[in-house]
């Protein structure tokens, strides 16, 4: 358990909730924009635990063009984070620094990421939070996987194929 928590300090994009059973939230934000800019989506996989220990995992979907939001709730046990790298699975949905695979009721497909522009880090400032990365029990942790990257792949959204080749993400 302690290794997992220390690893999360030096790899801020990784899951931070090891050993925590209540009053915790963590989510990751993936923005994708098609090359023609006709489609813009954000996907937020995450987990939430309330003060009583009630837990859930989720994937929130934001449509930046239609200005809509969908919330897909999952059992907490469907949430499977890696203990050594950024790799989060929620049932058949997968999010990593290389790609995301979606298997939601109205959105299915795979988007791969290339030429990631990462946040610079060092021993004393392992991520965007700087020295605050070392403060235990923060209410919120922030980590940047990529500030800009290329996309390849497509999604089937409401039975329509949407191409994200040569699109942009962050």
Where are these regions (language model features)?
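Targeting-peptide/extracellular-domain and disordered-appendage signature
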Residues: 1-170
């Amino acid at each position: 358990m302690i290794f997992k928590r220390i690893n999360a300090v030096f790899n801020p994009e990784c899951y931070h909730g090891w050993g925590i059973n209540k009053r915790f939230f963590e989510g990751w934000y993936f923005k994708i924009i098609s090359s023609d800019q006709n489609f813009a989506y954000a996907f937020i996989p995450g987990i939430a635990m309330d003060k009583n220990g009630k837990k859930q995992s989720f994937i929130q979907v934001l449509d930046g063009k239609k200005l809509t939001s969908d919330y897909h709730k999952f059992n907490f046990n469907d949430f499977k984070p890696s203990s050594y790298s950024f790799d989060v699975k929620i049932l058949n949905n997968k999010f990593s620094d290389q790609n995301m695979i979606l298997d939601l009721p109205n959105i299915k497909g795979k988007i791969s990421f290339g030429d990631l522009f990462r946040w610079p880090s060092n021993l004393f400032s392992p991520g965007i939070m700087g020295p605050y990365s070392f403060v235990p029990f923060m209410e919120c942790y922030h980590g940047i996987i990529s500030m800009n990257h290329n996309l390849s792949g497509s999604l089937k959204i409401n039975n329509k194929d949407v191409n994200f080749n040569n699109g942009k993400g962050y």
